[in-house]
Regions:
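ATP-dependent adenylation/nucleotidyltransferase module used to activate substrates
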Residues: 1-196, 326-328, 334-339, 345-347
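AMP-forming adenylation/ATP pyrophosphatase catalytic core
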Residues: 147, 151-347
């Protein structure tokens, strides 16, 4: 009996990667999934932190897809090597700070290394020609195959008939006639194929599975880079950009203000890394200070905290400021009126 050929499938948690893997399973290929953790993934982070919508069930879509397909899923931490993709994208950014083409090449390259290390034969993705304006155009697909080092061991089952034959097709491991020619942004072909396979539920991650496609998040990341004078970042930096209100009242410091109890509890874990303020006289949020306060800044920050506390209508609130070094200091200040909180401060 012939040993089945083995493919590693990039599993995002969306419909396309689920279908691509299922098409290969239908042809008798042994498939295992791989999912990469970059630190910018939307899934699960803010849901785990915020109480809002906590009652709604939340799943890890990549794990869920693997379960539906009956395949193993390998989740790989690529936070460190991925930094160069974000900081220095060879092919530039998309509409926001999303380096989509470089990202796809990086992911396929990581899958190629995994494939070689584990004795697999080829790589599959759920890409569809014309589905994404930057990374899934017919002109860019050869770039991904070449720059990742996967070359013709990269098979895209959903649009393979529109592309040159790959090694798995030429060698007869995969029947090209049973692959597909999906093209464009319409989801109807995928939905029809999902119905044939009996799939009735799937996630809709699309670009939304990465915070770098989000304009608000990208604006906050660009602000962080500008304020620090470098694009270097750590995981804590990009996690904190997902949490709270971010305000920059002055160029030399930024405030991170918790919006509710879940965020407050999360930010408590950073009290030893940031100067911070907390209300004493009224209920209210923890505020982290990212930067160094100068003369006159502390009163302003205390008044901003008062604005977001339950004492916003009171004549005065008392707050405690704890610097990174030195004793804590209590201040009593009038809360900042809303008209004195410029929209431009909000990131």
């Amino acid at each position: 009996m012939n040993t089945p050929r083995k493919a590693v499938a990039l599993i995002s948690g969306g419909l396309d990667s689920m279908l691509a893997a299922r098409v290969m399973l239908e042809q008798g290929i042994h498939v295992e999934g791989i999912n990469f953790f970059t630190g910018f993934c939307v899934e699960g982070h803010t849901h785990a932190i915020r109480r809002q919508d906590r009652a709604k069930p939340k799943r890890n879509n990549a794990l869920w897809v693997a379960e539906q397909l009956g395949i193993r899923l390998h989740i790989v931490d690529v936070i460190e090597p991925y930094k160069d993709v974000v900081i220095n994208p060879k092919h530039g950014y998309g509409q926001n700070l999303n380096p989509c083409l470089d990202c796809k090449g990086f992911m396929v390259g990581q899958a190629r290394a995994w494939m070689e290390e584990h004795g697999f034969d080829f790589i599959i993705t759920g890409e569809v020609i014309g589905q994404r304006p930057m990374s899934q155009r017919k002109q860019t697909m050869p770039i991904v195959a070449r720059e990742s080092g996967a070359f013709d061991r990269l098979l895209r089952p959903l649009c393979a008939k529109l592309l040159p034959e790959t090694l798995p097709e030429r060698e007869g491991w995969v029947d090209r006639a049973r692959l597909y020619d999906f093209n464009g942004r319409s989801r109807k072909p995928q939905q029809a194929l999902a119905a044939r396979f009996g799939f009735t539920d799937w996630a809709q991650p699309a670009g939304g599975c990465c915070f770098l496609t989000d304009p608000n998040y990208s604006h906050k990341l660009a602000d962080l880079w500008q304020a620090r004078g470098t694009k270097l970042y750590e995981l804590d930096d990009i996690m904190l950009l997902k949490v709270g209100r971010h305000l920059r009242p002055r160029p030399h410091f930024k405030l991170i203000v918790a919006r509710e109890d879940g965020e407050n509890n999360f930010l408590l874990g950073y009290r030893r890394q940031f100067a911070h303020l907390e209300p004493l006289s009224h209920g209210g949020p923890l505020v982290l200070v990212d930067g160094v306060l100068q003369d006159g800044d502390l009163e302003l920050v205390a008044r901003i905290l008062g604005r977001y506390s339950q004492g916003r209508e009171a004549p005065a609130v008392t707050v405690r400021y704890t610097p990174l070094a030195g004793p804590a200091q209590d201040l009593t200040v009038p809360p900042l009126p809303v008209q004195e909180l410029p929209v431009e401060w909000h990131l």
